[in-house]
């Protein structure tokens, strides 16, 4: 049996530069893997069988099934697989769980079926599945550009602690598309925010004040209950709070574990769904 981890992520920066002629948006984003991971177990089988320990997760609605089908087409394999997924990343949370699992599927089948594709080829295939998938092939700390297909590894961050607050909100299936539709002219930026953040990372001193998410203002307008959760996060002791991807998860990054633990415990005492995790380097 082959077992792989599929880590969550947060966008330290997420800039939308402009809408492209092909309908996609040009992005510039610095992404960071987290130690909150789904676990995928692969074993040989004559047919494809996918299961999960989460009753809310449906294989046919996820990128996982699409990843198995696409990889089978690309490598010319009709071999099956028995795939079991232990879900830990909250669904539809902005933490990239579906994309991360899809990337793990590509890496796992590449090993299980002996296809021998290099990393760059897996990233090409991943780009056909979704914008975040190429990043998850690599993981760690990276700059993502284009619509997500261009990923450049960055120096691994000195370990930091992230506290995640997952609001108890029912999010629409087209959440990300709705955010894109509601972007305003002042939502678009030049990429300089990510450049400044990149400079601070390369100097080994990440400046949290530079964290930015183009979706944040729009998300708080479309889902006004986020305001309440943000205030409760502040009351728990957080001071620099960002939206994770397309949300609704909110997060804060800290260098001191004790401070992170206090914020985490304060959130849990209030009955919130919260996680205390660390930043993560690239996975093999």
Curated annotation (Swiss-Prot):
It is an enzyme of class 2 (transferase). The active site is at residues 9, 132. GO terms for biological process: isopentenyl diphosphate biosynthetic process, methylerythritol 4-phosphate pathway; terpenoid biosynthetic process. The keyword Aminoacyl-tRNA synthetase does not apply. Keywords: ATP-binding, Isoprene biosynthesis, Kinase, Nucleotide-binding, Transferase. Pfam families: GHMP_kinases_C (PF08544), GHMP_kinases_N (PF00288). ATP binds at residues 90-100. It catalyses: 4-CDP-2-C-methyl-D-erythritol + ATP = 4-CDP-2-C-methyl-D-erythritol 2-phosphate + ADP + H(+). GO terms for molecular function: 4-(cytidine 5'-diphospho)-2-C-methyl-D-erythritol kinase activity; ATP binding. Pathway: Isoprenoid biosynthesis; isopentenyl diphosphate biosynthesis via DXP pathway; isopentenyl diphosphate from 1-deoxy-D-xylulose 5-phosphate: step 3/6. Its EC number is 2.7.1.148. InterPro entries: GHMP_kinase_C_dom, GHMP_kinase_C_sf, GHMP_kinase_N_dom, IspE, Ribosomal_Su5_D2-typ_SF, Ribsml_uS5_D2-typ_fold_subgr. Belongs to the GHMP kinase family. IspE subfamily. Catalyzes the phosphorylation of the position 2 hydroxy group of 4-diphosphocytidyl-2C-methyl-D-erythritol. This is 4-diphosphocytidyl-2-C-methyl-D-erythritol kinase. It comes from Dehalococcoides mccartyi (strain ATCC BAA-2100 / JCM 16839 / KCTC 5957 / BAV1). The lineage of its organism: Bacteria, Bacillati, Chloroflexota, Dehalococcoidia, Dehalococcoidales. The gene is ispE.
